[in-house]
Amino acid sequence: MDIAIQHPWFKRALGPFYPSRLFDQFFGEGLFEYDLLPFLSSTISPYYRQPVFRSVLDSGISEVRSDRDKFVIFLDVKHFSPEDLTVKVLEDFVEIHGKHNERQDDHGYISREFHRRYRLPSNVDQSALSCSLSADGMLTFSGPKVPSGVDAGHSERAIPVSREEKPSSAPSS
């Protein structure tokens, strides 16, 4: 059986009008303009893939900052309410878990769940940890650092998530 292999510089006559990037979509995050106009990318090359950097930054990547005075985690959880989130400190780790049951949105029914685990620096004061959810869905987990030589206190406990009415001051990537 002979299989015809098409050179990348030659395209089908209607090739630009067929969506060929089905697996580039971030399911549950909606569509961008270039998802609706697939012929723009295939006119360059049939092997061209849209950059996903913008989509990845908007899809829940966290940012961890650890400076001299404090430790902060920023996490985009815009699809979750404070009741859907659980934040626990287990020895040297903070575990953030989010889950919401199936609900209807513009495209059908969807359920989401994530689990993130971060190592806390040894000099973070675990008795002063706080967690808040901004109006735009940015979860901020923070704790002050203590001078070296002072016991930071390690224990297992749940951190309540408080709701803020203002948007986050986290950097937009």
UniProtKB/Swiss-Prot annotation:
Residues at which Zn(2+) 1 binds: 100, 102
Organism (species): Zalophus californianus (California sealion)
GO MF terms held by the record: metal ion binding; structural constituent of eye lens; unfolded protein binding
Changes after translation: Acetylation at Lys-70 may increase chaperone activity.
Xref: Pfam families: Crystallin (PF00525), HSP20 (PF00011)
Gene Ontology CC: cytoplasm; nucleus
Modification N-acetylmethionine, positions: 1
Modified residues (Phosphoserine): 45, 122
The protein's name: Alpha-crystallin A chain
Compositional bias per record (Basic and acidic residues), positions renumbered to this chain: 153-167
Classification of source organism: Eukaryota, Metazoa, Chordata, Craniata, Vertebrata
Function, as annotated: Contributes to the transparency and refractive index of the lens. Acts as a chaperone, preventing aggregation of various proteins under a wide range of stress conditions. Required for the correct formation of lens intermediate filaments as part of a complex composed of BFSP1, BFSP2 and CRYAA.
Self-association state and partner proteins as the record states: Heteromer composed of three CRYAA and one CRYAB subunits. Inter-subunit bridging via zinc ions enhances stability, which is crucial as there is no protein turn over in the lens. Can also form homodimers and homotetramers (dimers of dimers) which serve as the building blocks of homooligomers. Within homooligomers, the zinc-binding motif is created from residues of 3 different molecules. His-100 and Glu-102 from one molecule are ligands of the zinc ion, and His-107 and His-154 residues from additional molecules complete the site with tetrahedral coordination geometry.
Sugar-modified residues: 162
Subcellular location: Cytoplasm; Nucleus
Span list, region Disordered: 144-173
Keywords: Acetylation, Chaperone, Cytoplasm, Eye lens protein, Glycoprotein, Metal-binding, Methylation, Nucleus, Phosphoprotein, Zinc
Positions bearing Deamidated glutamine: 6, 50
Entry binding sites for Zn(2+) 2: 107
Domain (sHSP) ranges: 52-162
